[in-house]
């Protein structure tokens, strides 16, 4: 479909061009939900695996376990996406063609002997007899470690093999095991003395977007982990406003996202919040002023958790870029810090009233954009922290909120992990195992498992790859398998339990739950011209905007579709239709 201007009934409709297709698994947003290229809704339900952000520049615990074993079991256990924290320093090294070499401190890797060899007695010693762990991560001699960039490419390939999707999270400017405590995305030196600037941060992410633009295993980029700092720190703290100040996270994220999408318009852009925003408590309050004991000028939140600024200063990207935005707050429980909203006998409603709604939940509820809770998790204390985890888990399930649990690793002091320990034996190597036995925190996994995307009756885990099922043990499905064989029958736990028609409409055995309008001569939002406005129209919007050549939209359909008054048929129109379907606006307000 060529870009241009189409005139219908006196309305100039500018058709938005889309980039050439670079894979069939890229995702985009309409309202608060994510969809695939066919207009089918998807749900990202995954976990974090950190280590690339650290001095080892490699996901942790590959010093104890085989990567293939770990990822296979992660997939078999239903995790359909992994958030990989990384440092700007590591990305810059890769960009400059100077990746560090892996070391034994970060990974145990060997293939000994590297080839079959004569045992000296007329027999053969098979390759790998004396050592076969992470063998793809050493050179042909079976012992020299490869570099960190090649290692990540291998890890990404294994994710693809098992139907797992991934995205990178810039966790800190510098490679440091405690780098996350630094406030900003710029202003720290690399080991070689190079200062990580805002421009270098952007350049390294654009380089990564270019490198992986043809591999939809890597779905997108979390631009910066937990921008934070107290308001009274002024320019040393991340803020969210309409300025062009370097510490304005909203401005920096906009510049970075636009640059990434110029290279790969299909990538998802995950944008976290800040720590504090201005409260407006008193006239004349300003960012950087001293705090007050009462009537504070600042509203606090978790690091990266404060997205209040989106209401007044939403991220606005070039072209159709807003369709790639996913806002990504972090949320934790009292075992990390006993915040004021945990002081009472809290419930879902008190958490919404005291913190969640105005801080981030409104973005989902008001159909502004999708959410992905990039970090949540904690210790199983049998008390307040566990209660909070269960409440947040159920809220995410019931409100189609994407999430990545913190974390797989066992070595997160604040939270612990889903893994408990590992053992490896060369004697256990077979066609289905490289010898790793993985022990899980089964009680924590059981709590978390309910939030994984799965079918309602058979409990099949649903992957995000159209062709490759999630895992190999028969418990997982590809996206095509789910929509062909399960969506219209048993459905899934998305939205707390839904059955979907093959066109993506939510149904129950007795009735549809979509909102329909009375047929009119000019039916705003009715892009498919079936005489009503329903979720089916939103699906057609998705496919049209993505330049799906199998969908047909007539001139009258385009006239109906333009509801924002800007003469452009794009995701803004689809969002407005979703707001109408959710009863946030009337049909009269749907008209441009």
Describe each region flagged by the PLM:
Residues 353-504:
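Substrate-binding cleft of secreted/luminal carbohydrate-active enzymes
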Residues 1-3:
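N-terminal export leaders
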Residues 7-16, 505-592:
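Cellulosome-associated attachment modules in secreted, modular CAZymes
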Residues 53-60, 111-149, 183-199, 227, ...:
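The substrate-binding groove and active-site-proximal loops of carbohydrate-active enzymes
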């Amino acid at each position: 479909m060529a870009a241009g201007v189409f005139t219908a009934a006196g309305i100039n409709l500018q058709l938005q061009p889309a980039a050439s297709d670079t894979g069939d698994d890229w995702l985009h947003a309409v309202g608060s939900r994510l969809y695939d290229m066919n207009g089918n809704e998807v749900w990202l339900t995954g976990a974090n695996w950190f280590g690339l952000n650290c001095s080892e520049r490699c996901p942790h615990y590959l010093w104890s376990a085989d990567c293939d074993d770990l990822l296979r079991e992660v997939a078999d256990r239903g995790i359909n996406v992994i958030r990989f924290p990384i440092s700007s320093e590591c990305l810059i090294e890769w960009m400059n063609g100077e990746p560090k070499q892996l070391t034994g401190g970060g990974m145990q890797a060997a293939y000994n002997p590297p080839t079959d060899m004569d045992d000296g007695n007329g027999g053969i010693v098979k390759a790998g007899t004396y050592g076969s762990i992470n063998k793809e991560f050493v050179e042909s001699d079976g012992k020299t470690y490869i570099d960190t960039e090649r290692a990540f490419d291998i890890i990404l390939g294994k994710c693809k093999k098992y139907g797992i999707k991934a995205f990178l999270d810039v966790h800190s400017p510098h490679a440091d095991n405690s780098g996350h405590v630094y406030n900003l995305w710029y202003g720290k030196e690399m080991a070689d003395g190079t200062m990580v600037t805002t421009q270098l941060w952007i350049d390294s992410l654009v380089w990564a977007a270019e490198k992986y633009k043809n591999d939809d295993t890597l779905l997108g980029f979390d631009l910066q982990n937990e921008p934070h700092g107290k308001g009274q720190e002024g320019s040393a703290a991340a803020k969210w406003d309409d300025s062009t100040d370097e510490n304005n996270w909203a401005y920096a994220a906009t510049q970075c996202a636009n640059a990434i999408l110029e290279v790969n318009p299909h990538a998802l852009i995950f944008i976290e919040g800040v720590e504090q925003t201005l409260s407006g408590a008193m006239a004349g309050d300003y960012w950087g002023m001293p705090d007050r004991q009462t009537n504070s000028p600042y509203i606090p939140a978790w690091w990266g958790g404060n997205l209040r600024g989106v209401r007044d200063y939403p991220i606005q990207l070039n072209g159709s870029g807003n369709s790639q935005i996913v806002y990504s707050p972090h949320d934790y429980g009292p075992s990390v810090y006993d915040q004021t909203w945990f002081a009472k006998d809290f419930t879902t409603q008190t958490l919404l009233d005291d913190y969640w709604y105005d801080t981030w939940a409104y973005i989902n509820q008001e159909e502004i954009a999708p959410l992905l809770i990039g970090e949540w998790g904690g210790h199983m204390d049998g008390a307040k922290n566990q209660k909070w985890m269960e409440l947040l888990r159920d809220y995410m399930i019931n409100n189609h909120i994407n999430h990545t649990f913190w974390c797989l690793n066992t070595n997160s002091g604040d939270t612990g992990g889903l893994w408990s320990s590992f053992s490896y034996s060369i004697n256990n190597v077979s066609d289905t195992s490289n010898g790793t036995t993985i022990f899980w925190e089964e009680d924590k996994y059981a709590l978390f498992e309910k939030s994984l995307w799965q079918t309602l009756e058979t409990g099949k885990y649903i992957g995000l790859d159209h062709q490759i099922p999630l895992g190999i043990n028969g418990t997982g499905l590809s996206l095509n398998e789910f929509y062909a064989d399960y969506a219209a029958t048993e459905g899934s736990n998305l939205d707390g339990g839904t059955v979907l028609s093959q066109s993506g409409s939510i149904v129950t055995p007795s009735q549809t739950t979509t909102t329909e309008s009375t047929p009119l001569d000019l039916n705003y939002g009715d892009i498919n011209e079936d005489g009503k406005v329903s979720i089916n129209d939103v699906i057609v919007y998705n496919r049209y905007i993505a330049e799906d050549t199998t969908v047909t939209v007539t001139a009258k359909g385009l006239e109906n579709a333009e509801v924002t008054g800007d003469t452009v048929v794009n995701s803004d129109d689809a969002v407005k239709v979703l707001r109408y379907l959710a009863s946030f606006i009337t049909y009269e307000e749907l008209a441009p």
